[in-house]
């Protein structure tokens, strides 16, 4: 059963700034990867420990966390997480 996807305000703002091509890619990743197998992303360390990321392009990533108990994935960011 797929996980529910919830997008934070910040992630929505990030997605709105992306090109149409990257927005389609975000949608495909959310539906086909993250909702189905959320732990396939890269585990993050440091300030973002406990979160995961999936690459959009060379610079940008989707950053998300998983609530296993509720079967919900929270999309936190959809841009770089490297401080740019």
Residue ranges of model-derived segments:
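A short, surface-exposed loop/turn module that caps and links secondary-structure elements
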Residues: 31-56
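Enriched for short, Lys/Arg-rich terminal
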Residues: 2-13, 17, 21-24, 39, ...
